Amino acid sequence: MEEIKVNVELREKAGVKGVLSAIRAEKKVPAVIYGGQKEPISVSITEKDLKAILKAGSNSVVTLSTPAGKETAIIKEVQYHVVKDTPNHVDFQRISLKEKIDVVVPLKLTGESADVKIYGALINQVLREVAIRALPTAIPHEIAVDISALTIHKAIHISDLSLSKDIEVLGDPERAIVHLMVPREEETVAAPADTAVQPESSSTKGKKDEDGALAKDKK
């Protein structure tokens, strides 16, 4: 995994609303560096550098250069503005390149199942990320899940993932990731034809009887 290097600035009066607003007005994002049995450090990072880290992919290893020294970290959380959807705050977690860490990695479907083309089967991805344990440099940005051989009524489970031996998957190995569903056909039931014989009304029957009687008298 490529290591990213950026400069961050120390910030004072952490958490003060006016200070945070001033930082954001300068196209910077407030952040904190924590973990590693050290005291947290309040810093700020430019929006440009943060976007570069996020573009590189989740769980990217970042070297943060501060006036107090260098910190090796990964992004643990990004908070976004509820309206503008812009980064509002970033949490960086200190890491050691020699120690395994637990992270969550996205699952990306690849390939195309023949049953989707032939039968119109629907793809139902029930698990979109998985927790793993690995050295920071061995952590993938995403894990590919090939559905080319997937058929109807079958599923791909966590245990079916093809991963490096350096990566340990956490959680239930039998948990399903994706399966194919048969589309439910709408059955159209035709309404039965109205073939029942309608009973004659009393007035009609009386008229027929009267006509019959008159015909006999004429004879």
From Swiss-Prot:
One of its GO terms (molecular function) is 5S rRNA binding. This is Large ribosomal subunit protein bL25. One of its GO terms (cellular component) is cytosolic large ribosomal subunit. Part of the 50S ribosomal subunit; part of the 5S rRNA/L5/L18/L25 subcomplex. Contacts the 5S rRNA. Binds to the 5S rRNA independently of L5 and L18. Residues 206-219 have a biased composition (Basic and acidic residues). The lineage of its organism: Bacteria, Pseudomonadati, Elusimicrobiota, Elusimicrobia, Elusimicrobiales. Keywords: Ribonucleoprotein, Ribosomal protein, RNA-binding, rRNA-binding. It comes from the Bacteria. The keyword Manganese does not apply. It comes from Elusimicrobium minutum (strain Pei191). Residues 188-219 are annotated as: Disordered. Belongs to the bacterial ribosomal protein bL25 family. CTC subfamily. One of its GO terms (biological process) is translation. This is one of the proteins that binds to the 5S RNA in the ribosome where it forms part of the central protuberance. Pfam families: Ribosomal_L25p, Ribosomal_TL5_C.
